[in-house]
């Protein structure tokens, strides 16, 4: 075998081992540790906690919107538990929707259940103080885990059992009062003001040790804003980042992110990375959900500039029902480091007589980034 062919074979073997879910979890000191954490691509799930309403609840849900089968067309999907997504499905990104509940019990008697005379929800965690995980309060509320702290403990337990994993990216959407439910007597969601945001940071820190997190303070360089740090100096290497968890704010620029960055324009002392506008002091993470059309090149430019980007490969359930995979192809080729889907496993779309699934080319839980892949990192399936 020639030296060139031998070198290529070794590079492919290294990448294959690195990409396999089991080996990715075990490999903490492999030859690719000098890669930076933005030089890879992983699959994440959208609404990672979501479980579907019962048939009576769906009927009550759709009656609110005039009787059209809205739920079955948009929300009829369920995810495995968070540990199963991370383990069996090889997911490395999660999304959780958050509702503040400092006293406990605020969301325990949803509007739909009141209309059905079904009684309040019975799980004790609904009545405990602490942030809750809900898609839409009153209207779509079943979850694999109810309290944020409980969900995060599941993630931490998996992480500690698989210490060599690439960084887990956890997207948090901070929810507010739903206008439809609110108009019908639904719950009033407390504001995400400075105090609530401080409680969010504290709740995350109550589960994860400082050494288990990647925060803006870990990325920002002395004398530079967070944005200039990632653009000029780059992200941490995988050697530093493996086995750790990173939290990203889903909400775009607005009142909530303004409250989170108040007095901390580069997120000093904060846990979350905000979804910001490129060029702003806090801009390290950017969300671009639609990867098709002109957005494809925009995402590639952002990735090349040094930003961490999240995009989506599908919209439930239109993508599955249509059979159109252009969004999936665009998302995977965009270079966005986090590609989110509702169908990360073979068989999840079979109920719709489809075989739609989103996976990295060649399989595995992680691959070299297709847009900013460094020379030593060669994928068999670019």
Region locations from a protein language model:
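Secretory targeting and sorting signals
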Residues: 2-26, 97
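Catalytic cores of phosphodiester-bond hydrolases, prominently lipid phosphodiesterases
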Residues: 27-382
């Amino acid at each position: 075998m020639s030296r060139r062919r031998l070198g290529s074979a070794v590079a492919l073997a290294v990448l294959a081992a690195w990409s396999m879910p089991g080996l990715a979890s075990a490999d903490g000191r492999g030859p690719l540790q000098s890669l930076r954490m933005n030089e890879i691509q992983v699959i994440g799930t959208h609404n990672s906690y979501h479980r579907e309403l019962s048939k009576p609840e769906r009927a009550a849900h759709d009656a609110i919107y005039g009787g059209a089968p809205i739920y079955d067309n948009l929300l009829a999907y369920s995810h495995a538990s968070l540990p199963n997504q991370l383990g069996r499905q090889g997911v490395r990104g999660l999304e959780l929707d958050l509702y503040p509940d400092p006293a406990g019990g605020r969301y325990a008697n949803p509007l739909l259940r009141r209309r059905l005379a079904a009684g309040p929800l019975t799980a004790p965690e609904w009545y405990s103080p602490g942030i809750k995980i809900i898609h839409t309060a009153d209207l779509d509320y079943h979850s694999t885990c109810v309290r944020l702290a409980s969900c995060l403990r599941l993630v931490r337990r998996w992480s500690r059992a698989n210490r060599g994993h690439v960084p887990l990216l956890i997207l948090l959407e901070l929810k507010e009062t739903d206008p439809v439910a609110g108009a019908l007597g639904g719950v009033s969601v407390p504001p995400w003001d400075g105090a609530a945001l401080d409680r969010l940071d504290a709740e995350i820190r109550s589960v994860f040790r400082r050494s288990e997190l990647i925060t803006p303070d870990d990325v920002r360089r002395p004398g530079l804003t967070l944005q200039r740090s990632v653009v000029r100096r780059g992200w941490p290497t995988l050697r530093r980042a493996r086995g750790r968890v990173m939290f990203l704010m889903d909400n775009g620029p607005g009142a909530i992110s303004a409250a989170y960055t108040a007095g901390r324009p580069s997120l000093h002392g904060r846990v979350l990375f905000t979804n910001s506008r490129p060029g702003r002091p806090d801009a390290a993470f950017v969300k671009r959900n639609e990867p098709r059309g002109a957005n494809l090149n925009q995402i590639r430019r952002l990735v090349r500039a040094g930003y961490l980007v999240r995009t989506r490969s599908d919209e439930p359930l239109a993508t599955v029902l249509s059979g159109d995979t252009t969004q999936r192809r665009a998302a995977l080729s965009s270079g966005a480091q986090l590609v989110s889907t509702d169908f990360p496993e073979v068989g999840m779309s079979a109920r719709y007589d489809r075989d739609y699934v989103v996976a990295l080319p060649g399989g595995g839980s992680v691959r070299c980034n297709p847009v900013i892949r460094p020379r030593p990192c060669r994928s068999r399936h670019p």
